Amino acid sequence: MCDDEVAALVVDNGSGMCKAGFAGDDAPRAVFPSIVGRPRHQGVMVGMGQKDSYVGDEAQSKRGILTLKYPIEHGIITNWDDMEKIWHHTFYNELRVAPEEHPVLLTEAPLNPKANREKMTQIMFETFNAPAMYVAIQAVLSLYASGRTTGIVLDSGDGVTHTVPIYEGYALPHAILRLDLAGRDLTDYLMKILTERGYSFTTTAEREIVRDIKEKLSYVALDFEQEMATAAASTSLEKSYELPDGQVITIGNERFRCPESLFQPSFLGMESCGIHETVYNSIMKCDVDIRKDLYANIVMSGGTTMYPGIADRMQKEITSLAPSTIKIKIIAPPERKYSVWIGGSILASLSTFQQMWISKEEYDESGPGIVHRKCF
């Protein structure tokens, strides 16, 4: 492990996108959708080289003839065979490396079932013969990437949203909150409210078009009621979007109604608190002495925090919940879409981290349970 030539591999398996690359790099080399697609139809032409499954971008580009499945739901791996295909694709097709020659750092959502990380460990050592591996908590890596040791991370991706308070490098597990409301739910909601305008999107392939509309045109309103009034009174907020077949659609108040459900989950028929209340509740579960430091270091990470206006709205909402004398600071770095991966890259290249790896020898001696002792 002392050999500096061997760069560790960092793989951040998100519910929506898989980010992979080499430790020490400042950005992931490969970013592709965590999708496995299987043909819906019978192949009739011989010699076409049809495969029985497609992964990532290739599945995305052939989506018209495939059924697309995401093996990771709400941050938990639900289909291990498909997950193995995604890892295989990551190592051999995207990064073009032999996994048996590099230590592998994987990431995981907090409050995941224990069996999940055991199985991850088992597959890395037994299927891919990795020399060493480690499983890190996603939100902790985001904090590394922001250069802090204290703060509360709001990590919101495609499948799951978490708030994780960390003080002087220690995660406070009793105060971690998890919200199963994230990007995929917002895409579904946008599909629904676009139907009210007379645009119908139904299939798994059309859902990807709506996801693109969401990513390009949505924003968070600072004052929702006022924005609704503006949208009703004029057309200044309307934007147009061209569909793949050349048809142009117009989208108005849907632009901010969609991400508003992060703050008002009742829009989706969910009983849970909005993300601002979740952050507040998480801070309130911490010791009274450290709350002040957490309020001053609220770090946003993940793709669902990329909406324009979300940081200002968060500042406003938390300010109205917190005591009036407290200083509140929201940190929303521009690269936050990849901050989990960047944090992993930083962690895996630290010299002090090198003794933390789980080696193949330790695994052979103790079995998959070792992951709970060495990774927390």
Curated annotation (Swiss-Prot):
GO cellular component, one term: cytoplasm
Species lineage: Eukaryota, Metazoa, Ecdysozoa, Arthropoda, Hexapoda
KW Membrane (keyword) present: no
Gene3D superfamilies xref list: 3.30.420.40, Actin, Chain A, domain 4 (3.90.640.10)
Family: Belongs to the actin family.
Native source species: Mayetiola destructor (Hessian fly)
GO MF annotations, alphabetized: ATP binding; hydrolase activity
Residues with the Methionine sulfoxide modification: M45, M48
Catalytic activity, EC: 3.6.4.-
Mod. after translation: Oxidation of Met-45 to form methionine sulfoxide promotes actin filament depolymerization. Methionine sulfoxide is produced stereospecifically, but it is not known whether the (S)-S-oxide or the (R)-S-oxide is produced.
Protein name (database record): Actin
Modified residues (N-acetylaspartate): D3
Propeptide residue intervals: 1-2
Keywords per UniProt: Acetylation, ATP-binding, Cytoplasm, Cytoskeleton, Hydrolase, Nucleotide-binding, Oxidation
